[in-house]
Amino acid sequence: MKLIKVTLVFSLLALVFVAQTEAQNPIWENWLACNRIGTKALASLLRETIPTVRNLLNCIDFNPPTDIGNSYLSKLKLYYELVKRGALDKTQCLIVPLKESVRLLRPYVKSLETNKCLGE
């Protein structure tokens, strides 16, 4: 008799969990679709980053010193010099990669908006 009660309880729990899983299935599918779009966008951006950074360094004509050290502050100064040259001296060098990034990400952002992934 005790075994029957336990079996009934587990059967009811299984039915509740299966019903709950089916109710959340569209939410899960939407979440997976949104993550798939985001992963593709990130992969595309990373794939284009290396040549873009190389072109940016060539455009700015920036040669980092060889003995910058391993400290955080020395690397911060190096990044500051790079951004300062790009922002103040050769602004076109920074604008072109930004425009390229916007062009690259535009279809992914539209897909995210279409699937209602943003703001939920």
Curated annotation (Swiss-Prot):
It is found in: Secreted. Main cells of accessory gland and seminal fluid. One of its GO terms (cellular component) is extracellular space. Its main location: secreted. Keywords: Behavior, Secreted, Signal. It comes from the Eukaryota. Changing residue 22 to K: In strain: ZIM26 and ZIM42. GO terms for biological process: sexual reproduction; sperm competition. Residues 1-23 form the signal peptide. Responsible for physiological and behavioral changes in mated female flies. This is Accessory gland protein Acp53Ea. It comes from Drosophila melanogaster. The lineage of its organism: Eukaryota, Metazoa, Ecdysozoa, Arthropoda, Hexapoda. The gene is Acp53Ea.
